[in-house]
Amino acid sequence: DYSIGLTEVYKLLVNNLPCKEQRKRKKIFNIIGASMGSYRAASDVWELQNLMREAFGYEMHTCLCYETSVDEIGDIGTAEINLVMRQEGLPAAEVLKNKFDMPFVVSAPYGYAATLAWLEEVGKILGQLPDVKMCARLRLKAQNTASLKMYAMMMGRKKTPQAAVIGEYDLVKGLSAFLRSVGIDVKYKLCNHSLKSIVEPELDIQYISVEKEKIDILKKMQKT
């Protein structure tokens, strides 16, 4: 299973490449778990960089493993915080926490409300409030998005829209939560890799190894 392989590679890199002595640098963060096999991984990295820059004035140092050099991994411990994009990066983040006392936050956010909550969590670790204007903008957008469910009811929608979400574990988890928040019933949550490397996976997220079984599930959606 490729997710297990990614987990082991990330651990191998952070166990062997970083120098023993690391001098902390201010306003620097790392991203862990940006596998280029992930859907729109480069876009996610770009989005996290923009969020951290606007909210806290932080810049990215090392990104495992997207456009990162051996030297950057060698001094990965100089950053103040690690942002773990995927569950596969969690064990590596634990290693770095033990080696260099580096805190971390797990998962990239989906949706305005989740982004706001995520920024507040990061801010608590950094000891810095996120940018006030940015938070106000996100809060307004979150309110507008949440009102979509109410508008649909006012327009006389008789049937709740249903969806199936398929992808990597963190995408399925985050996107499903966002869809529920706007009034869409997520009927099926299908992970495209096994859950062996996931710590305490959500019970309603399934891994189906047989493609025909997955197709049969999706065919059922045509009748909803």
Give the location of each predicted region:
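An N-terminal assembly and electron-transfer interface module characteristic of large anaerobic redox
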Residues: D1-T224
